[in-house]
Regions:
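Active-site loop of short-chain dehydrogenase/reductase
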Residues: 88-89, 162
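General small-molecule cofactor/ligand-binding pocket signal
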Residues: 30, 46-48, 135, 243-249
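A short acidic, often aromatic-flanked loop/helix-cap motif at beta-alpha or helix-coil junctions
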Residues: 53-59, 142-145, 251-257
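Terminal hydrophobic/aromatic helix or amphipathic segment near a protein terminus
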Residues: 217-218, 227-290
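Structural recognition of the beta-strand scaffold that forms the well-ordered cores
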Residues: 5-6, 69-70, 91-94, 135
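Oxidoreductase cofactor-interface core, primarily capturing Rossmann-like NAD(P)-dependent enzymes
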Residues: 2-28, 32-35, 40, 102-240
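NAD(P)H-binding glycine-rich loop region in Rossmannoid oxidoreductase-like domains
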Residues: 31-87, 94, 99-107
Length: 291
């Protein structure tokens, strides 16, 4: 019987554990968490409290584990990768539930504390030095980011500053949006979106097929929309309250009081303008509509 460790007991981790416990094939599921979770009492799941900064504690928790699925990023994931490789884990799924890996920048300037690049580099190193294989599940943006409560309503993203409503593109609770509509070449910016529930189902289905057959990356998407369409659909869902466009220049000199910090938005604009030195006016949505 395959022993699967899911690192992270809430949000996506809980969805994965609950669906694996109900899968047609039998798996021994162990949830690694920083604290106890009584909500697992009704599931055929073992909860193990771990300290991700304690090498000996992690090593003990990973004994006999075949597959590790991590649902959080940062330095603690790096510790988990090291311990998994050193303790004979065969397969590792990092917390890289976002865009396709071949289209990501080498360093995430918007979320530098995620250590995403470092995690992939470490996994490549352990692939050479051990028998551990790894696979990324690329799903684009979680649709639940656009809930009124953001990803936090799903207990996702609290440790990586992604939980709050409005942490990406738009905030449906305040009827505001900030997004670059076209890139430096004038092409429409589009995003792939997938519900976190569908991501969990996809991962479980892949486990049923067998990790031994997994490639380096498995991709999925629930939809692919331009950022204008994302804003438009959210506007229609908000009882018809519109989010109207406001054109802003690449260099910000001020910001509306309801917007995100200008430094963060400027970073996003600079990243999109990086391939060229041309000055292009980007269409940014940043408005407040009356309810």
């Amino acid at each position: 019987m395959m022993r699967i460790a899911i690192a992270g007991g809430t949000g996506l981790g809980y969805l994965l554990a609950s669906q694996l416990s109900e899968a047609a094939y039998a798996y021994q599921v162990v949830v690694l968490s920083r604290s106890q979770h009584p909500e697992y009492a009704g599931l055929d799941v073992q909860v193990t409290v771990v300290d991700y900064n304690d090498e000996e504690n992690l090593s003990f928790a990973l004994q006999g584990i075949n597959l590790v699925i991590c649902t959080f990023s940062g330095n603690e994931q790096l510790n988990l990768i090291n311990s998994a490789a050193q303790n004979g884990v065969q397969f590792f799924v990092p917390s890289e539930f976002e865009g396709s890996i071949d289209k990501r920048p080498d360093n995430d300037q918007l979320y530098p504390d995620s250590y995403s690049t470092e995690a992939r580099q470490l996994l490549r190193r352990w692939t050479r030095l051990s028998q551990m294989k790894w696979t990324v599940f690329s799903c684009g943006v979680f649709m639940e980011r656009f809930l009124p409560g953001g990803l936090g309503s799903m207990f996702i993203g609290y440790r990586s500053n992604l939980a709050m409503a409005g942490s990406y593109l738009l905030d449906t609770s305040s009827y505001t949006a900030e997004c670059v509509e076209k890139n430096a070449r004038g092409h429409t910016v589009r995003v792939c979106l997938t519900s976190v529930y569908d991501v969990a189902q996809f991962v479980v289905a892949a486990i049923v097929l067998g990790p031994a057959s997994w490639p380096r990356e498995l991709t999925m998407r629930g939809d692919r929309l331009s950022v204008r369409d994302v804003v438009g659909q959210c506007s229609r869902a908000l009882n018809g309250n519109p989010i109207k466009p406001l054109t802003m220049y690449p260099k910000l000199t001020h910001q509306p009081p309801f917007s995100f910090p200008s430094g963060r938005l400027q970073t996003l604009i600079d990243l999109l303008l990086r391939p060229t030195s041309r000055v292009i006016i980007q269409s940014i949505y940043s408005t407040v509509s009356s309810k």
